[in-house]
């Protein structure tokens, strides 16, 4: 390909020179001089193997670009893998956060329900305690009224008995009462 390029290039460069006026192979013809200079320049380039050096440099540059493209492709794949990993982790963290929120909500609802049950139990206990205190106070009042009635009845009976019985009969009744109390206590 390189060998075909040089003759084709020379052929196309000589075409304008052939169209010039006057003898072509004269040193007065600038087209001929330019053609000779160009051929000499190309010859120098070929002699010093500049086309091979240039193609080698271009090949190295192409290989460098290819390596950079492969590296960029690998980096892109790695970045996509990392992105997918982070997105997956984000979804997992979001799912965990949602689960924590749901659990906290359930716990709060359960705590509220338990607090309501505890409050109702506390109210029931206080109500029962109040009812017990009321019943106790009522029983104490009834007992006090009965005791007072017994005391009044005893006092009235004592007055009636003392007014109707004599001193000897009262002493006999007191002695019998003391014996009865002793018998019941022992």
UniProtKB/Swiss-Prot annotation:
It comes from the Bacteria. NCBIfam families: PRK13455.1. The chain crosses the membrane at residues 5-25. Its main location: membrane. It is found in: Cell inner membrane. Keywords: ATP synthesis, Cell inner membrane, Cell membrane, CF(0), Hydrogen ion transport, Ion transport, Membrane, Transmembrane, Transmembrane helix, Transport. GO terms for molecular function: proton-transporting ATP synthase activity, rotational mechanism; proton-transporting ATPase activity, rotational mechanism. It is a single-pass membrane protein. This is ATP synthase subunit b 3. F(1)F(0) ATP synthase produces ATP from ADP in the presence of a proton or sodium gradient. F-type ATPases consist of two structural domains, F(1) containing the extramembraneous catalytic core and F(0) containing the membrane proton channel, linked together by a central stalk and a peripheral stalk. During catalysis, ATP synthesis in the catalytic domain of F(1) is coupled via a rotary mechanism of the central stalk subunits to proton translocation. Signal peptide: none annotated. One of its GO terms (cellular component) is proton-transporting ATP synthase complex. InterPro entries: ATP_synth_b/b'su_bac/chlpt, ATP_synthase_B_chain. Belongs to the ATPase B chain family. F-type ATPases have 2 components, F(1) - the catalytic core - and F(0) - the membrane proton channel. F(1) has five subunits: alpha(3), beta(3), gamma(1), delta(1), epsilon(1). F(0) has three main subunits: a(1), b(2) and c(10-14). The alpha and beta chains form an alternating ring which encloses part of the gamma chain. F(1) is attached to F(0) by a central stalk formed by the gamma and epsilon chains, while a peripheral stalk is formed by the delta and b chains.
